[in-house]
Amino acid sequence: MLITFEGIDGAGKSTQIKKLQTVLNKAGVESVTLREPGGTEVAEKIRSILLESRHEISAVGELLLFSATRAELVQQVIIPALQTDAVVILDRFYDSTRAYQGYGRGIDLTILETIIAFSTFNLIPDVTFYLDIKPEDAMIRKNSKKSLPLAFENSDLDRMERSGLEFYSKVRNGYFEIIRSEQHRFKVLNALEHPDDLHRQILETLRKKKPALKALNRY
């Protein structure tokens, strides 16, 4: 089973992924937790290039670098894990590329879909949890954690985070467009709800999606 988590930066994906991983471990469910970009030696090196603020990368270059890390991760880690019936939890997948590079950066969506299909070997998540939060709220949340001023665009954050409110509004709207076209695999969550409440909703959704995870009823 492939589970993906999506949302703009500051939505709380990492918190929910950690909670889910803990429950799966306690229930004795074999699982693997990964992140994009990253997950392999090559992908982690590319991640540092993508996220370091001193590097300026074109929209197309950014897309191709993300796609390179994804191809490595899917072929080397995700597919082998799924073949052993492990649950794979992924912090971002190709929906992030659609939202960020497509709707955010303005890259042609038709070209984007071709590259996505090629780099993922047409792998589709079984369920995608989208944690929704307004960019303004996400920025306040992230800056409060980093003890930085609220002038988000001017803060010394990584290159992508410095894109600002307008960019993140485009990304959020892009996610809504994606969800409308593939409602069957998305579970939309209000990221401002208490983390424990969100966790319960995630477990309930997984139990319905995969009866084999009935062991999660105890948690």
Curated annotation (Swiss-Prot):
Pfam families: Thymidylate_kin. The keyword Magnesium does not apply. PROSITE patterns: THYMIDYLATE_KINASE (PS01331). One of its GO terms (biological process) is dTTP biosynthetic process. Its EC number is 2.7.4.9. It catalyses: dTMP + ATP = dTDP + ADP. Keywords: ATP-binding, Kinase, Nucleotide biosynthesis, Nucleotide-binding, Transferase. One of its GO terms (cellular component) is cytosol. It is an enzyme of class 2 (transferase). ATP binds at G7, I8, D9, G10, A11, G12, K13, S14. One of its GO terms (molecular function) is dTMP kinase activity. HAMAP family: Thymidylate_kinase. Phosphorylation of dTMP to form dTDP in both de novo and salvage pathways of dTTP synthesis. NCBIfam families: DTMP_kinase (TIGR00041). Belongs to the thymidylate kinase family. This is Thymidylate kinase. It comes from Chlorobium phaeobacteroides (strain DSM 266 / SMG 266 / 2430). The lineage of its organism: Bacteria, Pseudomonadati, Chlorobiota, Chlorobiia, Chlorobiales.
